[in-house]
């Protein structure tokens, strides 16, 4: 059976008016490297091997902030959650009220990001926190025979 995984390149359409704040946030707060800077598009490297392009568009061609909050979030991993949380808050982003212990916020341009620790156990989000295993396209029951809670 063919296998599929997410790649390490992403792109987001964002309002052209947010270009300076996007550059400042991703470069100065998150520590990204701007690989290529342009009028219509910027390419950033985040960490060792993740690339994200920001495609600068007119307002009517992009999601507004409420659209992003209803769509998808990206996860940011850091080796110092407390320090990064302070830097993000000091920049002045919109913090979202999500029933989860992690920081969810909207970065400049509207993207929703979740901040977690690099070594944090995230098995509760993977459906594997109660001992079940993903085998051949289906979850198996725990070794003790109980079905995991939903």
Predicted feature residues:
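Conserved positions at the start
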Residues: 7, 41, 100-102
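Conserved acetyl-CoA-binding loop of GNAT-fold acetyltransferases
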Residues: 27-35, 92-94
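Conserved short beta-strand elements that form part of the metal-binding/catalytic scaffold
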Residues: 33-68, 112-123
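N-terminal beta-strand motif that seeds the catalytic metal site of vicinal oxygen chelate
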Residues: 1-23, 71-74, 121-150
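Short, flexible helix/strand-to-coil boundary loops that buttress conserved ligand/catalytic motifs
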Residues: 26, 88, 126
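Vicinal oxygen chelate
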Residues: 14-20, 69-112, 117-120
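Short secondary-structure transition/capping segments
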Residues: 46-48, 106-110, 126, 130
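A general structural signal for short secondary-structure boundary/capping elements
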Residues: 54-61, 92, 103-104, 116-125, ...
